[in-house]
């Protein structure tokens, strides 16, 4: 199972790929330029690990709190991928997780 976690709600654009029990991540500056090329950042990131968008099993996107523009952009990209490739997506919010030690990106699929 290949899960992709996207968080553009904060100071960095954070991408995490959970591929067959292995965890890979990358972060980028959260700027207008990177908002405009979020799809390219995602494509390049998963391509690094020999995956295509269609091979992603589930998508997870941070729905806040944080930058409205970042949330709007990342949610739009995730919805587009979901519709085009028929991949389920889930929104998460770290504030909903409660217990501090669970607030890790790698726990998002378990907690959602």
Model-derived features: positions:
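Short beta-strand segments
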Residues: 5-7, 62, 111-112
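Conserved phosphate-binding catalytic cores of ATP/NTP-utilizing and phosphoryl-transfer enzymes
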Residues: 92-110
